[in-house]
Amino acid sequence: MNQIEQKWQQIWYDEKAFEVSNESSKPKYYVLEMLPYPSGKIHVGHVRNYSIGDVIARFMTMQGFNVLHPMGWDAFGLPAENAAIKNNSHPKDWTYSNIENMKKQLKSMGFSYDWSREINSCDPQYYKHEQKFFLELYERNLAYQKESLVNWDPVDNTVLANEQVVDGRGWRSGAIVEKRYLKQWFLKITDYAEELLNEIQNLKEWPEAVRSMQEKWIGKSIGANFHFKIKDNEDNTIEVFSTKPETIFGAGFIGIAFNHPIIEKLISKTPEILSFITKCSHITGSSELEKTEKEGVFTGLYVIHPFDSNIVLPVIITNFVLMDYGTGAVFGCPAHDERDHELAVKMNLPIKQVIETDIDVQKTAYTEDGILVNSDFLNGLTSNEAKQKVIDEFEKLGIGKRSVYYRLKDWGISRQRFWGCPIPMIHCEACGIVPVPCSDLPVTLPDDVSFDGHGNPLDHHPSWKHVNCPKCDKSAIRETDTFDTFFESSWYFTRYCNSNATEMTDKKACDYWLPVDKYIGGIEHAVMHLLYARFFTKVMNEQNYVSVREPFKGLFTQGMVLHATYKDEHNNWLYPEEVVKKGNEFFHKESNNRVVQGRIEKMSKSKKNLIDLVTMQEQYGADAIRLFVLSDSPPEKDLEWSASGIEGCSRFINKLEHMFEAIASLIDDVNSEINKELNRLVHFTIKHVADDIKHFVLNRAIARMRELSNAISAELNKEVVDVKTVRYGFNVIVQLLNPFIPHITEEIWQKLGNKERLYNSAFPAFDESMLELDTYVMAVQVNGKLRDTYEFKTSASEDEIKQITVNLPKVQKFLEGKEPKKIILVPRKIVNIIV
């Protein structure tokens, strides 16, 4: 099989089979899988992702489209730098070596990529364009630097975005994340929050789950900002933001963030307060906050209720109010908010009901809208009416106003690492922050770099950071932070339209290809990469780089590939190839010691539950692997890797070869009858396989093709074979299977005597009239009970059906010589004879 696969891969390469032109009279179709990080090896999870994309690309080509299906490398990032530290080498060497190996692996799988458009994000000829784009953002005040409380990973020595912190730990290192103040570069994605939110409803070809995740991440909240005076210090106030200001008469406390400025200004830091602040500083984001037990510590301060000066509320530092959301302060209404209720119960704070309900709010919060009670001038109003009225009162008193907040924060793009795109800015004592002139781009990374494992190598490089200021020519310092790697992946899809463009994009090429028609990747990128790419596209549109404002018309999120995990008696993880099954138990191949099978989980390096792709290819071939990862489960669902599954796919491919040999030896028989049912099945399969591929039900498409192959095999085993239909059906099945298993189908297609390449052939057409059955079976009932079935010709009239069914022997038995009172017909399904 490997020889056949290598043969066709070479032919495709020689013929430039998948290189497409930007000038074509055909309709365009742009299919793209999320570009990979060059880790060194393609794993089976990648293969599934790329196989899905390849089926779509090849299918759309056969449908007559001009298909762009490119590939490139998201090549900056921490693993390369960590490998450099470990091996005392430059990250570039490790990265380029990995790219070479992975490219070879991708080609060996037969994916139909246009390699002439390959991009590499660590190539200065790529990132010089994003450096220029950053300067344009800076000029428009969409890029800025400020001191910010950041998530610091003490192992990787870098800042992490909130999304990169999982359960308080760094997503890569697993280290407990700390909070630090650092000067950071930000992009003003919040300027686009409203458009990003509103446009979600137009992304109709995106999964609902992703759309919902983006809506929640942007998190629009409409409410009010208003001030509480501090008791005994009325010159000072605490400003709160609330989405439910109508519950103001149920206020039980004021909750503030651990880093709220009022703490430094007015609050004595007791050991209890200091300890609590330290504890809060380890909470890294709202996702972790939601899981954390709600706690607080009293500050000693009270505020005065804005509508009743006799009511004073304690000011409490809480672990669930964040400084970067709203004002960093809220009023707590325990009766009608779950978090506030949890804290009130714990700290013995008052719980006052202000919305009508039968629920006992002392036991559980009532969080729905309703009619206001115990609320002075708001009594009897609905929640919405009360909200409008109380905000009107705030505005009359001059203590508050209507406001809108977003959960979405500006995108922190600074990373204190070497292996990333340098931020093209210079710090001058005399001139301040000075952009690098465009004529000096790209700012490249130095080759002579030392990795001692501590901090950012750019910061302690002896010469790289020392430059003259472009404005005053005095000594200055380069910015030593590099871009977050999501910067590169936020615009790469535009570069594929013409990867040799002298500017960031070739506008004409982008106008032809964009938006991407189908984007394929993991749902884990829903609120980072996909949101950032949408943001970049809007800004690029305003900078006249592209005409679209949304990058991806359709999105498909594939499931993961899973495998069982194994551990030895010392609790060490084992690779699947180190384990052998004997009966119902597992043993180590070499030591023969018992092995414990663990959970079936996502394939990962750490748990060693990986399948070596090279070994699988040598054993089964690329086509069998491709077929298996698409056939055992719907593409959007997780897939469990199984040896029996891939062996079954390998047998199916061998069966195709045997079928070809059997068909090739057939001699035309003019006396053979046409197998109408087989002919109908061929046309039925063409129609429904096309529909299945269009709707990404690839496993069902494969099942239909297997069914057709079984029907052809059954016909071949008859004494008198319908040669014409068998040959036609086999040609069709080879064409239908080509997007899934391209190598063996090209080989068989050629042996069938076809001159045109299969990848370039038209998808087979079906005849609608052939889909009609000559006959159909109806259930025959007497008084609603099934008594018989009968196969009718499609041409049978109602009268004929009634006459035939009444005279059936099994029906006559129950009629007992009586005439039917009525005969009810449900077309093509049931005849019910009423006696």
UniProtKB/Swiss-Prot annotation:
Cross-referenced InterPro entries, in alphabetical order? aa-tRNA-synth_I_CS (IPR001412), aa-tRNA-synth_Ia (IPR002300), Leu-tRNA-ligase (IPR002302), Leu_tRNA-synth_edit (IPR025709), M/V/L/I-tRNA-synth_anticd-bd (IPR013155), Methionyl/Leucyl_tRNA_Synth (IPR015413), Rossmann-like_a/b/a_fold (IPR014729), tRNAsynth_Ia_anticodon-bd (IPR009080)
The record's PROSITE patterns line, in alphabetical order, gives: AA_TRNA_LIGASE_I
- Asked if the record carries the keyword Secreted, the reply is no
Q: What are the recorded GO MF terms, alphabetically?
A: aminoacyl-tRNA deacylase activity; ATP binding; leucine-tRNA ligase activity
Q: Could you provide one GO biological process annotation from this protein's UniProt record?
A: leucyl-tRNA aminoacylation
GO cellular component terms attached to this protein's record = cytoplasm
State its location(s). Answer: Cytoplasm
Record's CDD domains? Answer: Anticodon_Ia_Leu_BEm (cd07958), LeuRS_core (cd00812)
> Motif ('HIGH' region) spans which residues?
36-46
Q: Which reaction does it catalyse?
A: tRNA(Leu) + L-leucine + ATP = L-leucyl-tRNA(Leu) + AMP + diphosphate
Query: What residues bind ATP, as annotated?
Result: K605
Gene3D superfamilies the record matches: 2.20.28.290, 3.10.20.590, HUPs (3.40.50.620), Isoleucyl-tRNA Synthetase, Domain 1 (1.10.730.10)
Signal peptide range:
none
Motif 'KMSKS' region boundaries: 602-606
One family name in Pfam for this protein: tRNA-synt_1
The superkingdom of the source organism is Bacteria
Q: What broad class of enzyme is this? A: ligase
Q: Which UniProt keywords apply?
A: Aminoacyl-tRNA synthetase, ATP-binding, Cytoplasm, Ligase, Nucleotide-binding, Protein biosynthesis
Give EC number(s), comma-separated: 6.1.1.4
Q: Which family does it belong to?
A: Belongs to the class-I aminoacyl-tRNA synthetase family.
Which NCBIfam families does the record match to this protein? Answer: leuS_bact
Spell out the protein name for this chain.
Answer: Leucine--tRNA ligase
The scientific name of the source species is Rickettsia felis (strain ATCC VR-1525 / URRWXCal2) (Rickettsia azadi)
What lineage does the source organism belong to?
Answer: Bacteria, Pseudomonadati, Pseudomonadota, Alphaproteobacteria, Rickettsiales
